Amino acid sequence: MGKLTLLLLILLGWLQYSLWLGKNGIHDYVRVKDDVVVQQGNNAKLKDRNEQLFAEIDDLNGGQEAIEERARNELGMIKPGESFYRLVPESNHRNANTAPSTNTPSNNIQR
């Protein structure tokens, strides 16, 4: 009976080693589980970004308003006879006053 007990203890020890320290053991499982959570978060961010891009594509394909908005914001285009005023934030206005320049407050308004 002693040999059978010894054999079973050795088998149990080998199984415990495989479970805790072996390939595809508990440590690998926990690491992969954490990686899956991180990847799911990245996938959710990318899915939101894709939805925004698809919405923007639909706007650009469907209407002139989106094209006009992009032309105004990115290219600074204005319609004929229209005046464009750029408001300078207060912090930029202070920095402009402290630095010696030829800009006056009336020059900060663009037409």
UniProtKB/Swiss-Prot annotation:
This is Cell division protein FtsB. The chain crosses the membrane at residues 4-21. It is a single-pass type II membrane protein. Essential cell division protein. May link together the upstream cell division proteins, which are predominantly cytoplasmic, with the downstream cell division proteins, which are predominantly periplasmic. Belongs to the FtsB family. Gene3D superfamilies: 1.20.5.400. The keyword Membrane applies. NCBIfam families: PRK00888.1.
